[in-house]
Amino acid sequence: MNKSLRAIAALCLAAVALIPAGGTIAAAPAVSTQSDASFAVSYAAAGVTNVSATTSHVSCYAPEVTYFTALTSADGYPGGGMTPCTAATTGEQTTGFETQDVSNPAMLVKDKSESDLRVDPKNPNHIIATSKWFVSAEGYNHLLGFYESWDGGRTWPVQGHIPGYEGWTDNTDPVGAFDPWGNFYALILPYEFVYASSGGHVFNNGSKQANPSQPPEAISVAVRPAGSTTATAWITTHDGHPDHVFTSKTDNANTPDKQWIAIDTNARSAHYGRVYAMFTQFVLNPSRILVSYADARPDGTHTDWSVPQLLPSVPGKPFDTYLLPHVAPDGTVYTTTTNNPVAKGFLNNDISLVWSSDGGVTWQGPLPIVQNVQTPTYQNTTFSEGIVNSFGLGSQLVNGHYPLYVTYENEDPSGLSNVYVTGSFDAGATWTVPMRVNDNAGPTEALQPNVNVAPNGAVTIAFYDRRLPCPARGGRDYVASGVAFDPLVPDGRANYCVNTAIQFYSPTLAPLGMNVRLSLHTWDPQLNAPKRFSIAGATTFLGDYFGVDSGGGFTYTTSISTFDYAGENPNHYQQQIVARIATPAARP
């Protein structure tokens, strides 16, 4: 591969180094770095603000399946276990759900991990974010929740669990999109399991399901109509039944996962208002990637979902997943696909591009983007890696095409996870040489990148960053950080605790400044971390991704912190912090 774009950032697009689609990863050239001290103060220098969005209200719901085994403060879980609700303040329904076949008491929502955030294109002060909404971190027991702002992220007065699918053990993978009329579509994955005596998850079928009255797994929709002001204002049925795009007949084969959504809001598109729902179906070890679509209506309803159809994949390699659709202003739908074979332990990733120019009826591709991306194993802590890549699309032409961007995390030969970005300015035919995004000078990790393109064309890549050490004993942030509860004793340790960071680029991927810190406080990822597979297992969870979007001259992220900002999070649960930063001009 040729040189990093950072070395030619000041040149025009014609001079940008390009490689044919399908190049493999080579060692990236050295990049400009900044000191840890400079990164630490960049939060204040850039005028970033933080709001602890999910601690302002008390949310509760009755789970379909309860799990009362708890860890303790000595395990790093202060306030652990499932706790009965005493007083919800959200206005949400907490019991008596139509899809449930049991009558359990309402439980307190504690952790909120993995997230998505969308700015309303009709009103940039209106933002809806969604997140996993845990009643038991130890049991990995959660629905999805939402939190909504009408003042550009300063306050989040409406929040609660997303209703309609309480009859499943878990609802997962938060993602949403606004339609042209301001209705918000949440695409949801409800699924069932019961607990083994060890705390592991058991996926039964038929009468042994957690709730035999419902399909064991589904891809489903909840719509929040424009102008809604209460936590319960969601449309969750279509033609008198739950609004399922797809259902599975069994809970351990032919199972759907990794769903994503995009809506055509381009007035000159022939398919204005079309909603695209994409997901992976795992058929034992191989997988299939599918798309279904419907047309949104102004009142928050929609037409029937089309029969899910297969998307193109690499011949002979049925291991595609991670669909991330976007719609260009001309109505073309693009998505990346990520091929990571189970035979290689899901450690080798080839990223490709597929697209449709006729409203999702027919599809072209795949075109290879980058190959042999190495799935990282993060050092020092127990949380697992997420989706390795993210995909973005610009709404302003570059070189006569709408620009495409892919960012990904890669485990480099050093054993550390780093973040890279590549772009295409010819509809995916060629891609720029991958450029490292994180600018830390020391041997620390960056992970879970998420790319977004602002309305002015500026490219934003947000990611988790581990360069700053954990708060040290006796330091200003030590008590509020909760690191004293961490049995791994990370006081003052580097490449352990986490901040959220962001890097801006011009439309041609010229860097606009250096990495900016988006977290006011460094936080410990081990505290109250959900146990992904079993309470007895080592693997914990932050999420596979987190939310970033732009509008009204600002860029927003919603990401985790366990820090107790102002006494609102004394048990150090995973909470969602919304950061706001001014979006720079798109040209350097």
Language model segments and positions:
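Secretory targeting and sorting signals
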Residues: 2-27
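C-terminal PAP-associated
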Residues: 28-588
